[in-house]
């Protein structure tokens, strides 16, 4: 069983360190990173899908179309992870 880490993202295109997340996944196989795009208006979602291509079994993406705040994004990630358990 993997431990899920929920990472809410809003307009994080320039701040997402793709290499660091992929490296973390390679070194820590017992974790699932669940990125929640919270209605970003930049290319955050594209960056997340690019990351997922490099680690498809260790990264999940939840796309919330309308920005609703961090708490809502975290709840969406928790619901997603719960549905996968």
Residue ranges and their predicted role:
Residues 63-70:
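Short, acidic/glycine-rich phosphate-metal binding loop used to engage nucleotide
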Residues 38-39, 68, 77:
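Conserved short acidic donor-positioning loop in nucleotide-sugar-dependent glycosyltransferases
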Residues 25-28, 53-58:
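Short helix-capping segments at alpha-helix termini
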Residues 3-12:
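A conserved hydrophobic helix/loop-capping motif in glycosyltransferases and polysaccharide synthases
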Residues 54, 72-85:
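Active-site nucleotide-sugar/metal-binding loop of Leloir-type enzymes
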Residues 37-46:
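A conserved acidic beta->alpha catalytic loop
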Residues 11-26:
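Short, well-formed alpha-helical segments that are part of the catalytic scaffolds
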């Amino acid at each position: 069983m993997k431990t899920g880490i929920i990472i809410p993202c809003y307009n994080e295109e320039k701040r997402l360190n793709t290499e660091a997340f992929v490296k973390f996944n390679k070194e820590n196989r017992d974790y699932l990173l669940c990125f929640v795009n919270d209605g970003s208006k930049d290319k955050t979602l594209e960056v997340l899908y690019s990351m997922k291509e490099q680690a498809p079994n260790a990264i999940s993406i939840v796309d919330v179309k309308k920005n609703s705040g961090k708490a809502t994004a975290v709840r969406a990630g928790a619901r997603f992870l719960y549905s996968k358990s």
